[in-house]
Amino acid sequence: MNIKELKDKITDYANIVGEQEGVEIVNVEIYPGGKGLTLRIFIDKEGGVTIKDCENFSRAIEAILDVEDPIKSSYTLEVSSPGIDRPLKNKKDFLRNIGRDVKITTKEKIADNTFFIGKIVDVGDDWVRIEIQETKIKGSKKKGKTELLFIPFNKIIKAQVYLG
C-alpha cells in the first residue's frame, strides 16, 4: 500500500472515530520519521479542542489501528488541534469562526481591493460576509469605512483568523 492509499484508509478510520467523539477531522498527514512513520491527525470542533478531546480521539484511533493494522512498520501517532492560524478553507471553517476577525486575500479585486481584514458576520453556501475594518493594497495601508462586504468563496485565495 502506498502512502496515498494509507492516508485515505487512515482518514476513513479517523472520520469514523471523529463522528463517535464529536470532532471534525481537519487533516491527516503521514511522513517518514526517525523510527518509522509519523501519523499526525488534526481535529477540531465548535468551541475548540481540549487536551481531553485529543486524548480520547488518540485512544479510539489507536484501538482501530491496532485491530486493522494498516501500518506495517512502527509509527508515532500525534493528535492535535490545527491551531488558530490555520487556513479557512470551506464553509464549515468560516461558520466556526463567526464573530472573529479574519484576513482574506482574493484573486481579483472586490470593492477595489484584494486584501481585507474584517469580522465574519454571516456565511452563505458560497460566500462569506465580513464587516471591514481595514483594507490593504499591495503593502500600502488604507483606512476604510466600516462596511459589510460579500466575498464569494471561489474568489478567495487565502483566509485565516486574524490575531493582530
UniProtKB/Swiss-Prot annotation:
Does the entry feature the keyword DNA repair, yes or no?
A: no
Any idea where this protein resides? Cytoplasm
The record's GO CC annotations read:
cytosol
Q: Known CDD domains for this protein?
A: YlxS_C
Q: Which InterPro entries match?
A: Ribosome_maturation_RimP, RimP_C, RimP_C_sf, RimP_N, RimP_N_sf
GO biological process terms held by the UniProt record: ribosomal small subunit assembly; translation
Judging by the UniProt lineage, the source's domain of life is Bacteria
Chief localization class? cytoplasm
UniProt keyword terms in alphabetical order: Cytoplasm, Ribosome biogenesis
- Say if the entry is tagged with keyword Cytoplasm: yes
Relate the protein's function as given in its record.
Required for maturation of 30S ribosomal subunits.
Q: Which family does it belong to?
A: Belongs to the RimP family.
The name of this protein is: Ribosome maturation factor RimP
Q: Could you tell me which species this protein originates from? A: Thermodesulfovibrio yellowstonii (strain ATCC 51303 / DSM 11347 / YP87)
